[in-house]
A protein has these predicted regions:
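C-terminal catalytic "cap/lid" subdomain
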Residues: 1-376
Length: 376
């Protein structure tokens, strides 16, 4: 067993994405038996102490079937209507199946904008992590009934990768109607060897995936590779596997050589901090006293309001701010939980005083250590 497969055995936070072709039996209708099987396997993962978020496709495809569409319509409003109709069937099927295993579920509808806007990102992050901590299975889909570009792209693979980053997942599982990633299109070349394990950033993979897409789900292997790279930047491994294979999730959890594993190059926390440090512009900054700088640098703790001496700029909740010490030297960057006005009010005060001063408490930390990228 490879070291990457061994790490899957210890994965605690999972994001599982099920594609349209699987859920709707290639457009015939909702695969109730398949859903029962996946829900049973997810329930088993929960029994083992794992936390699992489920990203589902299939709403638009199921809507096509219910509305009698034989071809994908060009009208965005027809697509939105199909999504609204199909979503009902998908959610009801999951709820019914999970109920058989005494599992609670929650519906979370997102658009990519929700994850790009830092304030909404923090709200989504907090909600999803709370659900996972309570042992609830979040059933996540794009809000296709109001979205536009998301429907046209059909990019739930990318949504799943963003969710994996959002909840600091250890593994992202993309269940599809293929055994994994092959060196060539298996529908054209049936004997094409399957890739067992590669780095997500292996450039040879680009030539292998080509540009093909399925008829029902718009995201083929190209988007799955792109999604794996997004997840890898957050330190999350990706497994592409055949959702129709019996007990496929259990096999992955046990480290069996199934599907294709695309590995991340860094650990999750390091990847998150690299992303914060390198890719997001600073909206402002805060200055820490010497004691706070020492605690953050030496012990890796969160930034608390009590250690802040000055506030710079006009940043909002969820923005990236530059953190400096009393000498002006940069300590790091981080995603801040309070805006500049609120931070200025609570600076120098302990966490217990936040509610009294603001009238509410979002987070006890000004910047959580998970969202803090140190410069030294």
């Amino acid at each position: 067993m490879s070291s990457a497969r061994e790490r899957l055995e210890g994965a605690q936070v999972w994001v599982v994405k099920i594609g349209s072709a699987l859920l709707t039996r290639d457009g015939v209708g909702i695969d109730a038996r398949g859903i029962d099987g996946w829900c049973k396997q997810i329930s088993a993962l929960l029994d083992d102490g794992k936390r699992v978020a489920l990203v589902t496709s299939g709403a638009v495809a199921e809507g096509f079937r219910r509305l009698g569409f034989t071809e994908r319509p060009d009208s965005i409003h027809e697509l939105q209507a199909a999504a609204a109709v199909g979503q009902m069937g998908i959610v009801q099927a999951y709820e019914k199946s999970f109920r058989h295993h005494s599992r609670r579920t929650a519906l979370v509808l997102l658009t990519h904008d929700d994850l790009s806007d830092r304030q909404r990102y923090l709200n989504a992050r907090g909600t999803l992590r709370t659900l996972l901590n309570y042992g609830i299975v979040p059933i996540i889909n794009e809000n296709d009934s109001v979205a536009t570009d998301e429907i046209q792209l059909g990019d739930n693979d990318t949504l799943a990768a963003r969710v994996a980053s959002l909840v600091s997942a250890d593994v992202l599982v993309l269940l599809t109607d293929q055994e994994g990633l092959h060196e060539d299109d298996p529908r054209v070349r049936p004997d094409a060897p399957m890739v067992s394990e590669r780095s997500a950033f292996d450039s040879k993979l680009d030539d292998m995936v080509g540009s093909g897409t399925g008829a029902l789900g718009r995201g083929g292997m190209v988007t799955k590779l792109e999604a794996s790279r997004y997840a890898a930047r957050a330190g999350c491994h990706t497994v592409i596997a055949n959702g129709r294979e019996q007990d496929i999730l259990s096999a992955i959890a046990n480290g069996r050589n199934v599907g294709t594993i695309l590995t991340a190059d860094v650990a999750p926390l390091d990847a998150r901090k690299q992303w914060i440090a390198a890719q997001v512009q600073n909206a402002g900054g805060i200055t820490l006293d010497a004691g706070a700088v020492k605690a953050v640098m030496e012990r890796g703790v969160s930034v608390l309001a009590v250690g802040v001496t000055d506030v710079h700029g006009n940043f909002g909740r969820g923005d990236v701010v530059r953190i400096t010490g009393p000498d002006g030297v940069e300590v790091g960057k981080g995603l801040v939980n309070y805006g500049a006005v609120e931070t200025d009010l609570i600076k120098g005060h302990g966490s217990e005083a936040i509610e009294e001063m603001l009238g509410y408490v979002d987070e006890e930390e000004l910047i959580h250590c998970d969202n803090l990228a140190l410069s030294q």
